[in-house]
From Swiss-Prot:
One of its GO terms (cellular component) is cytosol. The keyword Thylakoid does not apply. InterPro entries: Janus, Janus_sf. PANTHER family: BCDNA.GH02250-RELATED, JANUS-A/JANUS-B. This is Sex-regulated protein janus-B. The active site is at 69 (proton acceptor). The keyword Ligase does not apply. It comes from the Eukaryota. One of its GO terms (biological process) is cell differentiation. It comes from Drosophila pseudoobscura pseudoobscura. JanA and janB regulate somatic sex differentiation. Substrate binds at residues 42, 110-112. The gene is janB.
Length: 140
């Protein structure tokens, strides 16, 4: 009986530990790769990862109609921290997203974070179900 009680205590101790380590991983996998709005917008290419696990990062695109790339970055940092995830900016740029014409133009750079790899951004957009049939062009 003492052995069973001992195993029960081990199980109770292990549950919070497992929950701690699996929750950020699950959140990282559920994280949408693309979150952009319609119209002329600024965007960032972000690497999201579990602290200390940069090898298993997920690259995401985030873009909104805002005056500054910083607004996008800090809003995403706060959201990812709530999930136990870390964020690193890979650069930014601008987009013209015309959803009615199914066209997206990617161009420009970000003064704060530098230019994003627009071809990587295009690849991520085309991999999403919403934008896979869009005509996406990259300006130099």
């Amino acid at each position: 009986m003492k052995i069973l009680n001992c195993f029960s205590l081990i199980g109770q101790c292990a549950k919070p530990i497992l929950r701690t380590y699996t929750s950020p991983a699950a959140d990282l996998l559920k994280l949408p790769r693309v979150d952009i709005k319609e119209g002329k917008l600024r965007y960032l290419l972000l690497s999201v990862y579990i602290h200390g696990e940069t090898k298993h990062a997920r690259t995401v695109v985030r873009g909104w109609n805002t005056d500054s790339h910083d607004d996008i970055y800090y809003k995403n940092v706060r959201a990812m921290e709530k999930l136990g995830l870390c964020t690193k900016c890979l650069g930014g740029g601008k987009m013209d997203n015309d959803e009615s014409a199914r066209k997206i133009k990617i161009h420009g750079s970000c003064k704060t974070f530098g230019a994003a790899n627009h071809h990587k951004t295009k690849e991520i957009l085309l991999s999403s179900s919403k934008y896979k049939n869009f005509n996406i062009t990259v300006k130099k």
